[in-house]
A protein has these predicted regions:
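PLP-dependent aminotransferase-class I/II
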Residues: 102-157, 161-164, 171-175
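Conserved C-terminal alpha-helix-loop-beta "cap" of PLP-dependent enzymes
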Residues: 78-79, 288-361
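Conserved N-terminal alpha-helix of the aminotransferase class I/II PLP-enzyme fold
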Residues: 16-64, 85-91, 97
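Active-site C-terminal subdomain of aminotransferase-like
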Residues: 111, 155-157, 170, 203, ...
């Protein structure tokens, strides 16, 4: 609705103006399809340069769930499943897309840790972080192979993590190195979901770079849908493509766009003059302002998120009033009278947007 402001997610707006400009400029060009065009090649080259992985293979897919399903299916044998946090997107919010492709999601509990953000009056309500721990991953694999009946069970064939996580939290470089080392030890590929990758990379509290990710994982993707593109995700296989013919597999999963240059052109724009990182930084700066204002108003921060997703505990009566003017994301019911909600900033959020939000908070 036009008279409501939205902080419900980071994909409620169209695309960065420079992308729209380039789409307009090239609108009447006649371009080859399915990602075989020069725009896709240029975008792939820029992405490979940004992560210092000149031998990587890059493919442009249409959306996040299609990407997760396609990549995981590429990585696994028919008798294998993918290990993920029980809070992971593939385990909780993809309508069984992984299972629909014939693979089980083998869940691990996400662990808790002491929040870095603290407020003496109201510290973070939860210490949930939505990440998997290396030790838990190793135990799952060891326990599987220690079971005499493991030939009759779903094999752990790949590991899925996201950065940022569903809770907006981040893996440290040490955590990624530990998980990567375990995956290498057991010859299991590591897949990093980067739907919000830009927001993770530009967080003020990260020591992880895109070069680190390319070095430590077997495949990751650069999210466009939530970070300035109209749609699309750029999949980067850093250590070789796991199937002989990837394009037909991508097509089988409904993730191959006939007008593939529309994806390539967008990512070529995002990876020109560091635009992807610049607009991601805006979301982080706006989230910091939002969080500080929430604390000043006395609201209870729920999770210590250093990225663009901010989670807050609100009274249900207040939410009824707020919902008339603001779209927010429902997260979970905390108790009979309180709810956890998510406010998400994005690449285009302004200070004026936040000021408008706080007229109703």
């Amino acid at each position: 609705m036009k008279d409501r402001i939205s902080f419900s997610s980071d994909y409620t707006k169209g695309a960065h103006p420079l992308i729209l400009q380039r789409l307009q400029e090239t609108n009447f060009e006649q371009i080859t399809g399915y990602g075989t065009d020069d725009y896709c090649k240029s975008a792939a080259d820029k992405i490979k340069k940004s992560c210092n992985a000149k031998d990587a293979d890059v493919f442009f897919l249409v959306g996040g769930t299609q990407t997760n399903q396609t990549v995981i299916d590429m990585l696994l044998e028919p008798y294998e499943g993918v290990v993920a946090a029980q809070t992971g997107h593939v385990a909780a919010h993809e309508a069984g897309a992984i299972e629909f492709s014939g693979h089980k999601v083998l869940t691990l509990p996400s662990f808790n840790e002491e929040p870095q953000f603290t407020d003496k009056e109201k510290p973070c309500y939860s210490d949930q972080v939505g990440k998997i721990k290396g030790a838990d991953l190793k135990k799952l694999i060891d326990d599987f192979y220690a079971d005499d009946n493991h030939e009759h069970m779903v094999f752990p064939g790949a590991v899925y993590i996201s950065h940022p996580t569903e809770y907006g939290t981040l893996y440290s470089k040490a955590e990624l190195e530990e998980i990567s080392g375990i995956c290498k030890e057991y010859k299991i590929p590591l897949f990093l979901d980067g739907a919000r990758l830009g927001y993770g990379l530009m967080s003020k509290r990260t020591d992880v770079t895109i070069e680190d990710i390319a070095r430590l994982v077997d495949v990751f993707y650069v999210g466009g849908t939530k970070v300035g593109a109209l749609f699309g995700e750029a999949v980067v296989f850093t250590k070789g493509v796991p199937v002989k013919h990837p394009v037909p597999v991508i097509k089988q999963h409904g993730a191959l766009l006939a007008k593939g240059w529309l994806l390539g052109l967008q990512f070529d724009t995002l990876f020109t003059d560091d635009l992807y990182m610049k607009i991601s930084k805006n979301a982080i700066e706006m989230a910091e302002i939002l969080r500080n204002k929430l604390v000043e108003r006395g609201y209870q921060i729920y999770i210590d998120s250093p990225t663009n997703q901010q989670f807050v505990v609100m009274e249900d009566d207040k939410l009824k009033e707020l919902s008339e003017h603001v779209s927010y994301g429902f997260w979970e019911k905390l108790d009979d009278t309180n709810t956890v909600v998510r406010f998400a900033t994005d690449w285009a959020t302004t200070v004026e947007d936040i000021d408008t939000l706080f007229k109703y908070l």
